[in-house]
Structures are given as structure tokens and as C-alpha cells.
Amino acid sequence: MTGDRAAGDRAAADRTVAERAADRTVAERAAAMRASLESLGLGYENPRPGAFLVKLEGQHKLATMTWLVVGEHSLGVEAFFCRQPDENHEAFYRFLLERNGRMYGVHFTLDETGDVYLTGRLPLSSVSLDDIDRLLGCVLSYSDENFDAALELGFGSAIRREWAWRVKRGESLANLQAFARFADPEAGA
């Protein structure tokens, strides 16, 4: 692709979602979001009009499935972070709440069962391609960077039991290595 064409494609994709969906039909708003996601090179599913499921791949939390829902006036974002903690509830929730004040675009929330999500809402009139890129980058960063510490706080006993069970049976510990510092009895020796 030539530089002029790439710049033109970028400029066209950078128009706000609202501008590209001026008559505000669900189909046109969805088409604007589809164009934005494709411009960013992101794979997605579009299971219903205006709803896009994007898989964000991380290092600690291997996949963060993120919903982008184009509404009449706003773009909603929701990503599952983890289920409700088994233990140490106060420290677990304090850890997440302390992060909320430093976060852009999304924040940690709970559903009615206590499961934890990253959620946010932005006005469609101001959502550009760069905003979508930044918002998804934030979801990935917040999910990935906080995952191990949250699991240690809320699921430490279960992780230790799983570690011991795998060691006893000679099973792989590969996906538990992030927790070796506290789960491996020999690490403290």
C-alpha cells in the first residue's frame, strides 16, 4: 500500500463512529464499528446487530473477551475479568477499587453474582478510531496487569491446592508459574 493511500485510509477510518453513522440506524452504526475494528486489524464476532465480541490476547490473562456494544448515543464496553473471589474478599475488592481511580475509559465492576468485569461507556459523538484503539488497549492492559495479583488475593488457597495436586501427580505446572512465589513450598526454602 502506498503512503498516500495508507494515510487516506487512516483518515477515513479516523472519522468518529457518529460521523460515519449520521442517520443513526443500528446497521450503519454497526458498519462504522466494523470498519474501525477492521482498520485496527482486530478479529471479532458480530453475533447481533451493534454488538461486537473482540478477543484481546495477553500474557498473564491469556484472553480477555471484550464486548463493544454500539447504542443509540453511546459505545458500551464490557470484559469479563474473573469470577467472584473464594477468599480474602476485603483485600481483593480493595485492590481493584484502588485501581479504578487511575484507569481510563473502563473501571472494575461487579455483576449480581459478584463476578468482576471491566466496564465503561463513551458518547458515540466523540468516539474515533484512536479512542477505540486506546479503549481496547486499556482493557487489555488493566486485565493483564492486574490478573495475577487479583488471583493471588482471591484464590490463593485454591492455587496452592492445585499446585500440590499437580506436583503429586507429575502434571505440568506451566500455567501456574506466575504463582510459584507463594504456591510452591520449595520456593520459600
Set out the residue ranges of the language-model regions.
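Amphipathic, soluble alpha/beta structural segments
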Residues: G58, D111-G137
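Short, highly charged C-terminal tails/helix-capping segments
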Residues: L151-A189
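Conserved short hydrophobic interaction patches
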Residues: S36, L40, F95-M103, L135-A149
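A short beta-strand-loop-alpha-helix capping motif that often carries His-Thr
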Residues: L53, F108-R121, R160-W165
